Regions:
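Conserved catalytic core of nucleotide polymerization and phosphodiester-bond processing enzymes
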Residues: 1-177
Length: 177
């Protein structure tokens, strides 16, 4: 996904090395990025539009209007400017995902008084962890999925699919079918 946020071939090479243990030649990384951009022909155009808007405004926005200010976007230092540009491209995607999760959390909170047995424990990026009695797992999963899969706002026409895993500990989770 880094390519969507402006990852360069050398960055892809490093990511493949340290996260997947692959020694990928730089030329292969260049080809991967070129092919990805060919598969998504409007990607490069979108990236340029986002960078130009961010430079003009000095911030980038999520789809719901939450702003991320980018003081380095006009820097003469290439590293600082490049980082700000990647942040500008990241915000509409990852930031909007965070906004959607916050809306799902609000729906969950409203339903908690009727489900005193459902105990939210923590959030990890786009995951929510709950403590639930075994005899309430089915009911809990149905409720949580409904809250998380609800369309966050009218203009959002992308289906949201939430997956559920259960287990006695966080380390022993198994995906539910």
């Amino acid at each position: 996904f880094g390519v969507f946020f402006g990852l360069f071939p050398r960055g892809l090479q490093r990511t493949l090395k340290f996260k997947a243990g692959l020694d990928t030649p730089l030329s292969d990384c260049e080809r991967i990025i070129t092919n990805l951009k060919a598969g998504y022909p409007r990607l490069a155009e979108w990236q340029q539009v986002v960078k130009r808007q961010a430079e003009a405004r000095k911030y980038s926005e999520t789809w719901l209007g939450r702003r991320r200010y980018l003081p380095g976007i006009t820097s003469n230092d290439w590293g600082e400017k490049s980082f700000a540009e990647r942040c500008a491209m990241n915000t509409p995607i990852q930031g909007t995902a965070a906004d959607i999760l916050k809306l799902a959390l609000a729906r969950l909170i409203v339903g908690l008084p009727e489900r005193p047995w459902l105990r939210p424990l923590l959030q990890i990026h786009d995951e929510l962890v709950f403590e639930v009695p075994e005899d309430k797992i089915g009911e809990a999963v149905s409720f949580i999925k409904a809250c998380m899969e609800a369309q966050p706002f009218p203009q959002f026409d992308v289906p949201i699919v939430a997956e559920a895993s259960v287990g006695p500990t966080f380390g022993d989770m198994a995906e539910m079918g």
